[in-house]
Regions:
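N-terminal amphipathic/basic leader segments beginning at the initiator methionine
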Residues: 1-53
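Conserved mixed alpha/beta catalytic, RNA-binding, or beta-rich assembly cores of soluble enzyme
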Residues: 61-67, 71, 75-163
Length: 164
């Protein structure tokens, strides 16, 4: 593995391991939830961090095992997704994937968030700004599939790109 390359599913982990943690914007929210935003606009930085260019948002909390907090966090997540796609060009295709184990509350937030979204990439909805697809994906132990395998196939088929 290269000296300047770090691997994690989360951009935030890679920032911390690479000594770039000052690039993460931290914001305290209600119920002890912290929002951390990593904006990798620069190609050189995104290469060093080992993540494609983009905006990465992480929510950190220890209270996701409580239904009240989980519901609040799911609302925040779905709102964040809506904000992130709001700046895209009309007709862009957005693929939102919730990862986790739906059988364990603390790990089911991805699935719960996908249920809150309103997919608009359906044939009868023709006048939407962007075309949203939402999918929840279980963990490898429950599905036998690695997340990147399924996401790669979805990405190839859906081709979520900004409209030209």
């Amino acid at each position: 593995m290269e000296k300047d390359f770090f691997y994690s599913d989360m951009a935030l982990d890679n920032l911390e391991r690479g000594g770039f943690e000052s690039l993460a914007l931290h914001k305290k929210l209600s119920y002890g939830i912290e929002q951390i935003v990593v904006n990798l606009k620069d190609k050189v930085l995104s290469d060093k961090v080992g993540k494609p260019q983009g905006v990465y948002v992480t929510y950190d909390t220890s209270k996701a095992t409580d239904d009240r907090y989980a519901d609040y966090l799911v609302r925040i997540l779905s709102s964040t997704i809506t904000q992130l796609v709001g700046g895209l060009a009309r007709g862009s295709i957005v693929l939102s994937v919730g990862l986790g184990n739906g059988e364990v509350l603390a790990d089911s937030l991805g699935e719960m968030t996908m249920r809150k979204l309103r997919p608009t990439r359906v044939e009868y909805l023709t006048d939407t700004k962007f075309k949203l697809c939402a999918h929840s994906l279980g963990v490898q132990g429950a599905t036998g599939l690695k997340s990147h395998e399924v996401l790669g196939a979805l990405n190839d088929k859906v081709n979520p790109l900004p409209s030209s």
